[in-house]
């Protein structure tokens, strides 16, 4: 019987290292739930598991897309559900900090299968967010009530789905939860300690060659590549352009990562099914191992 263990939480809480240790004990595999680790060549800045780590335990949904491709939540859900159904190992580990990816699996979100429409998006974006939101209120008032008036990304997506399918996105959404047992484990620590973790990790990324990685990606794909405008890459890109110093790029990365971690914590805390553990507890691995044994034994006996 399939069982799934989710390891989630904010960035820099140690999810990957914990998952690796657990997977080795369990003889299991790791399915990534990180929206940037799916892209090839984006390695250091995404804290992607190293080649050596990936040799220790099979990792899935890492390095599956070119940086010029687009991986939607619907794509991720489809591939992950197929993996869970086909991999002959249990329990499986789903690990990452991309909340929508995790939610798409554990809650079985129904997601409209509408690929990004570049020309349509361009036409809509030219109208401005104020007009777009007014249009959404007319064609899909239910979705408009759930989307903030300044949320241009979700407004655009809702209109895109409506104009492609002729049906409001609110009527195409819902949930179809999986029928297998799921244990959701969250890692967290206090703000000051998380800030120190983020600082140390940022410094390590730079020491590991983040500047050279960004320089290579800019040369190969062009500085306008959308992924290069994401956390950790956009700041180094500013440094390479001569706009800021490397120290300033580092401090900006730390600041932006802390802000991102705050948003992640808010997202995950909204889900009561997640069982929280202190990432700085020296007995963390043993405590979670005990909880996993309870989970696997309970679901096996039932």
Swiss-Prot record:
Cofactor(s) for this UniProt protein: Mg(2+)
EC number: 2.5.1.75
Residues making up the signal peptide according to the UniProt record: none
EC class of the enzyme, as a word: transferase
Entry binding sites for substrate: 11-16
Catalytic reaction equation(s): adenosine(37) in tRNA + dimethylallyl diphosphate = N(6)-dimethylallyladenosine(37) in tRNA + diphosphate
Site entry (Interaction with substrate tRNA), positions: 98
Cited Pfam families: IPPT
Record flagged with keyword tRNA processing: yes
Claim: Secreted is one of the keywords in the record: no
GO biological process, one term: tRNA modification
Matching InterPro entries: Dimethylallyltransferase, IPT, P-loop_NTPase
GO MF annotation: an example: ATP binding
Residues the record lists as binding ATP: 9-16
Family as reported in the entry's similarity comment: Belongs to the IPP transferase family.
Self-association state and partner proteins as the record states: Monomer.
Designated name of the protein: tRNA dimethylallyltransferase
Organism of this sequence: Nostoc punctiforme (strain ATCC 29133 / PCC 73102)
The encoding gene: miaA
């Amino acid at each position: 019987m399939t069982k799934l263990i989710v390891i989630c939480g904010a960035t820099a809480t140690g999810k990957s290292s914990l998952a690796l240790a657990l997977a080795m004990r369990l003889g299991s595999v790791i399915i990534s739930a990180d929206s940037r680790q799916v892209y090839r060549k984006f390695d250091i800045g995404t804290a992607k598991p190293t080649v050596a780590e990936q040799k220790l335990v099979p990792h899935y949904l890492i390095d599956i897309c070119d940086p010029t491709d687009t991986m939607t939540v619907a794509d991720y859900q489809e591939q992950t559900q197929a993996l869970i159904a086909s991999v002959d190992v249990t329990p499986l580990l789903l690990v990452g900090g991309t909340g929508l990816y995790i939610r798409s699996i554990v809650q079985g979100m129904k997601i409209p299968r509408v690929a990004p429409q570049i020309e349509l998006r361009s036409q809509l974006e030219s109208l401005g967010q104020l007009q777009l939101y007014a249009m959404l209120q007319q064609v899909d008032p239910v979705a408009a009530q759930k989307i903030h008036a300044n949320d241009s990304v979700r407004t655009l997506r809702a209109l895109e789905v409506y104009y492609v399918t002729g049906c409001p996105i609110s009527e195409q959404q819902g949930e179809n939860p999986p029928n297998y047992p799921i244990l959701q484990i969250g890692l967290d620590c206090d703000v000051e300690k998380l800030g120190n973790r983020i600082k140390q990790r940022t410094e390590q990324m730079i020491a590991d060659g983040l500047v050279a990685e960004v320089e290579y990606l800019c040369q190969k794909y062009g500085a306008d590549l959308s992924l290069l405008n994401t956390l950790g890459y956009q700041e180094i890109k500013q440094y390479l352009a001569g706009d800021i110093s490397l120290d300033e790029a580092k401090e900006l990365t730390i600041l932006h990562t802390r802000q991102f971690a705050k948003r992640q914590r808010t997202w995950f805390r909204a889900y009561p099914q997640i069982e929280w553990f202190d990432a700085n507890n020296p007995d963390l691995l043993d405590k979670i191992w005990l909880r996993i044994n309870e989970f696997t034994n309970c679901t096996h006996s039932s």
